Amino acid sequence: MPVFIATGFPSPRIHTYSHCYTLEMAIQLGNSPARRNVELKAKLPSLETTRSLVQPLATTRLDDQHQVDIYFCAPQGRLKLRTINKQATQLIWYSRPDSSTSKTSHYVIARIDDPEGVQSALTGALGIRCRVDKHREIYLCDNVRVHLDTVAHLGDFLEFEAVLEPEMAPVTGHRQIAVLRQALSITDADLIQGAYVDLLEAAGAAAAQPPLPPISPQ
């Protein structure tokens, strides 16, 4: 996904929701609007089988990533601080329907130079919801990203992300994903709704995770 740098932060408004504080803050992104993609997520019966099917279709194979996402309580959409390979850190906000069918997602990504400070500020203002730890294989089929994810406490998953240019209609992404889904033999029974954080909470795995130390990229 493209990366945008947050350039200004107006005064926040803090509200209390249930057990955590939530922060309402508009992020000024200069001339860069939120981007869009079309997404679909599925549980994989066999990671090896799916890998063997996607490799011949991929136009590019990117380096694998170890991603640790810390989700914060947010009044709208989902907000997470992501560390990639213990090096780069991004703050990601996104909003999408919780549907098992392909859906359009709006998202913003900001590079973070002070991850410890940002994590501390967001923890104090919002409260931590959950941590998601995963290994991700990344394949590109033109503008569609195919992620093969092994998620701690959950298992193996596939995620399609059809990245939409400003002039592209969402229907284009839906059609691209439908073609790839058929090629990879993804059935209706494999499809899931929500995000990994929702699955962890539903499984009760989030409560079993150890306390979260500050992020320290190495």
Q: Where do the model's predicted regions map?
A:
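Residues forming well-ordered secondary-structure scaffolds
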Residues: 35, 117, 134, 155, ...
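Conserved, surface-exposed functional patches that form binding/active-site neighborhoods
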Residues: 128, 132-166, 170
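Intrinsically disordered, low-complexity terminal segments enriched in Ser/Thr
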Residues: 14-22
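N-terminal strand-loop-strand beta-hairpin
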Residues: 21-144, 184-218
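Mixed-charge, glycine-accented linear interaction segment located at domain edges/termini
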Residues: 168-192
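Intrinsic disorder/low-complexity segments
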Residues: 5-6
